[in-house]
A protein has these predicted regions:
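A cross-family phosphate/adenosyl-ligand binding-site feature
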Residues: 1-237
Length: 237
C-alpha cells in the first residue's frame, strides 16, 4: 500500500520570531511510519517542523510541514495518490490575523475593522504591557480528505482531556460520521505518558483497545491492511 501519515504539530506565525504551536512530538507518527515500513508499505510522512521522524529508508519520503496552509497544499497533492491516510497531526484550530496593543483596541469604535489589518513588522514591539491577538478559525483538514480521494482508507485521531470512555467513544463516533472516516483512534491526554498510551480504535461497529504507542501502531497497520484487502477483493471479483 501507499500510506500517507501526518504527524507532529503545526505552527501559526504571529511574526518572524513568534508563533502559536502545540505540544505534539510526533512520536506516535514516527512509530506508525516505522511499522508500515516494516510491513513493506510505501510511506509519505508529512511531519511538523520539530516532529520526531524515522531514520532514512528507501520506502520513506519525509516532508516537513510548517502551518495549516502548507499542510492543506501537501494534502491536495498527496491524498489522491494514496491508499490510506493516518491523520495523527495536531493541527492548529486558529491562526493569527492581527496583533495590536490593548489601548488601540479600546479606542477603536469598529472592532471588526481590526480584522482587515495585518502586521507588517518582522518583530512586533514588546513595549506594551498588554497585547491583543485576533485569531481566525482554520479549515478542518480531516474534513477534506475523503473529498480529495473517496476511496482512501481514512484513520483519524481524536484527543480529549480527562473524559470518560463513553464520552471519548461518542465524540470519536461523531468525528467518524462527520468526516466519513473508516476509523478514529480516540485517546485521552491524562492516559498518555512516556511508557503508556491508552487508545481506542473505533469504527461504526468496532472498538479495540491498545495500551502503548507500539500496540496502537500495530493495530492501525493491521486494520489498514484488512480494509485494503477486503476492498481489493471486492474490486477484483
Amino acid at each position: 500500500m501507499h500510506i500517507l501519515i501526518t504527524s507532529g504539530g503545526t505552527t501559526e506565525q504571529i511574526d518572524d520570531v513568534r508563533g502559536i504551536t502545540n505540544f505534539a512530538t510526533g512520536k506516535l507518527g514516527k512509530i506508525l511510519a516505522e511499522q508500515f515500513l516494516t510491513a513493506n508499505h510505501q510511506v509519505v510522512l508529512l511531519a511538523g517542523l520539530t516532529a520526531l521522524v524515522p531514520d532514512d529508508h528507501p520506502n520513506l519520503q519525509i516532508i516537513r510541514i510548517s502551518n495549516v496552509d502548507s499542510l492543506a497544499i501537501a494534502m491536495k497533492h498527496w491524498v489522491p495518490k494514496m491508499d490510506a491516510c493516518v491523520h495523527t497531526m495536531a493541527v492548529s484550530d486558529y491562526t493569527p490575523v492581527y496583533m495590536t496593543d490593548l489601548e488601540t483596541v479600546e479606542k477603536t469604535k469598529d472592532i471588526q475593522s481590526l480584522l482587515t489589518r495585518q502586521n507588517t513588522e518582522h518583530k512586533i514591539s514588546s513595549q506594551e504591557a498588554y497585547q491583543v491577538l485576533f485569531l481566525k478559525k482554520t479549515p478542518k483538514i480531516i474534513a477534506s480528505i475523503k473529498n480529495l480521494n473517496p476511496d482512501i482508507i481514512l484513520i483519524g485521531f481524536k484527543l480529549m482531556v480527562d473524559v470518560s470512555d463513553a464520552q471519548l467513544i461518542q465524540t470519536a463516533r461523531d468525528s467518524l460520521y462527520k468526516n466519513n472516516a473508516d476509523y478514529i483512534l480516540a485517546n485521552d491526554l491524562t492516559t498518555i505518558s512516556e511508557t503508556h498510551h491508552k487508545g481506542l480504535l473505533i469504527s461504526h461497529n468496532y472498538i479495540q483497545k491498545a495500551e502503548t504507542k507500539e500496540k496502537i501502531a500495530q493495530l492501525i497497520v493491521s486494520k489498514s491492511e484488512e480494509v485494503y484487502e477486503k476492498y481489493n477483493h471486492r474490486s477484483n471479483r
